[in-house]
Amino acid sequence: LILALSLTVASAAFAVTKVGVMTGTTSQGEEEYQAAQEMIRKYPGRIIHVTYPDKFMDEQETTIQQILSMAADPDVKAIALVQGVPGTAAAIDKVKEIRPDMFFINIVPHEDPMLSAQKADLVLETDNPKRGVTIVELAHRMGAKTFVHISFPRHMSYPLLSERRDIMKAECEKRGMEWVFVNAPDPTGDAGIAGAQQFILEDVPRQVEKYGKDTAFFSTNCGMQEPLIRSVLTTGAIYPEQCCPSPYHGYPGALGIEIPEGKAGDVAFILDAITEKVVAGGGAGRFATWKIPINMAFTYASVEYGFDLADGKIKGVDIEHMKALLTKHAGNAQFSTYNNVATGEKADNFLLVVGESIIFGGK
């Protein structure tokens, strides 16, 4: 494959430019996968789409090979990694050896934040430290007296996620809310995604029985969102936000919402459909998300950025241009750049985003 990269670089002149996109499968990241499919339809013949394996922790070499396969096409000028699972930094190094001109956008990095910023040209992520405040604040406003945070050791080894957890705990204490941390099975482990989902279906009723209906649930994993939404609605508890906030993340599958072909990407339609289902299920005022599909917006903006770069409309890292594209796809959002208060480390190419919340059936 490395040899193929070397042989094909020289033949790039005058070809149609392309952008590579790596996403999870429909099991691990349905929203990102569908966003990539939408880009394929929008830019026929100009998008190379690959997926990383569901058990990406054990199959990092597969992830690396998938990224290398996109870079082997000399017409690919930029690659968006949605999400930047382990193996991403090593893959970028390998590609840059042969294609130093390749532009990488790392979306939702799983590896060390500073390492991610050093390897990729641009990094995009929700502002997890700030969300540590806003999610608990929203849950409290929705009537939560207890906050249940569901995760597993691998996710808690990620600096931004562990920092957010600590902030959430402090915010709960500040508001007089009980803080509960629940260790769930890792979906990349032996039990797989099915085992993690089954745990959610069994554990949520136990927690509600113990702490009461005014309990807010938050999980750090994409694959857990559908069973979590379903269980919270059934038990009458509170669901303030997904790990990757978006009206498309978890809600349609959990609530049985069919999206007609003509309504794909129609955010107003999906917000109304969710509201109708939540209200009918007795969850009015107790379910929320962001008004924008953030990981889809990250994907759309990154693909457009890649084409703008390849077509000479911009050069290199242009944070303001990325902000403009994100505003186009995500609406009103707050932006900041990575700043680790504890270590003093900063990364100007690491853009953090917070969107606006909507409470379904709420006042």
Task: Locate the predicted segments by residue.
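Flexible loop/hinge segments that line or gate small-molecule binding clefts
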Residues: 95-128
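Periplasmic-binding protein-like
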Residues: 20-23, 74-85, 102-107, 148-150, ...
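Extracytoplasmic "Venus flytrap"
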Residues: 18-39, 43, 48-65, 80-86
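An alpha-beta-alpha
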Residues: 36, 128-181, 306, 321-327
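Short, well-structured alpha-helical segments in soluble
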Residues: 60-77, 94, 194-213
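Hinge/cleft segment of the Venus flytrap/periplasmic-binding protein
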Residues: 270-363
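Hydrophobic alpha-helical segments within soluble ligand-binding/sensing domains
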Residues: 123-148, 199-202, 270-279, 293-310
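Extracellular/periplasmic periplasmic-binding protein-like sensory domains
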Residues: 168-179, 226-311
